[in-house]
Amino acid sequence: TPLQPKYPGDGAPVEDLIQFYDDLQQYLNVVTRPRF
């Protein structure tokens, strides 16, 4: 299981926030994928 992305903070550059949400989406896709 991948590590949960760490929120960069409210003062972070927009690029960091975009990257965080991108990583978070990938993370959630892996974590919430059904395991058969």
Curated annotation (Swiss-Prot):
GO cellular component: extracellular region
Localization, UniProt: Secreted
Pfam families: Hormone_3 (PF00159)
Disulphide bonds in the chain: none
Superkingdom: Eukaryota
UniProt-listed PROSITE patterns: PANCREATIC_HORMONE_1, PANCREATIC_HORMONE_2
Alphabetical UniProt keywords: Amidation, Hormone, Secreted
Ranges in coiled-coil conformation: none
Gene3D superfamilies referenced in this protein's UniProt entry, alphabetically: 6.10.250.900
InterPro entries: Pancreatic_hormone-like, Pancreatic_hormone-like_CS
Modified residues (Phenylalanine amide): 36
GO MF entry, a single one: hormone activity
Cited SMART domains: PAH
Job of this protein: Hormone secreted by pancreatic cells that acts as a regulator of pancreatic and gastrointestinal functions.
Family: Belongs to the NPY family.
Protein name: Pancreatic polypeptide
